[in-house]
């Protein structure tokens, strides 16, 4: 049955794909891949990736017409000289100080035979036109095995304010350039498990988490697929976030009505002058960090130009957002 299905798919592609076309598996219309939490107690989480279809795009290469395979919501692996395939992502909340291991617990796929997948041009600057970058086949094209080989992987842990998270990467497209077989994984289910003490981006809390700002509550819902699972284990009070205004001294009077209006709206707002903090960006960074840990902080507003409120320098450029990295 599988062989028959593969043949039907191959004929369908060669007959109907003209330039770029969505090929539905569970949906006739282009829809984003699905990533959902099957169950999670934070120490262990099971995540399912589902593919409802994919897009094949014809690309003219030095070796003739070949294809780029993509899915809605995915992004190219961008491995120079390797088959140009998409990868998909999902983030989960993990323990504050644990290292996580990953295992694939189930998967299913369909195959497309006799298909040429074009090589990736890699990652390059926006100042370079893609048409100016030549196609090159890497050593992968001489290897009789599926690329990229692994079905899933973990990125380094990160901290997003109240939680420590980790991104799960799935590779639903696997291509063997020698046999010219493309495997499309319609389902990849993985399990993350705590596996010893964490070494990277460990979250050290000064106190237990019992309140979440409403604005960040929405961010967490969109960022972490197991956030709702986490809420069932811990009861958090969703509260209004606060604002700190750092203002150039000469503008303080003009900003008073703004601060008063914010407080009337129910957003606790405090204004301080630059002169009371210090004239350097490091002094402002230290003040913001101390304020965050002492009072909590959701919004930071800087009132003044760079000559009046200095900015941290990142790679030689001013970077106001760096004040938010605590």
Predicted regions and their residues:
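Sec-dependent signal peptide recognition
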Residues: 2-11
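Hydrophobic alpha-helical segments of integral membrane proteins
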Residues: 10, 18-19
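Extracellular pro-sequences of secreted precursors
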Residues: 19-302
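Intrinsic disorder/low-complexity signature
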Residues: 2-3, 210, 317
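Surface-exposed loop and adjacent secondary-structure segments within mature catalytic domains
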Residues: 297-326
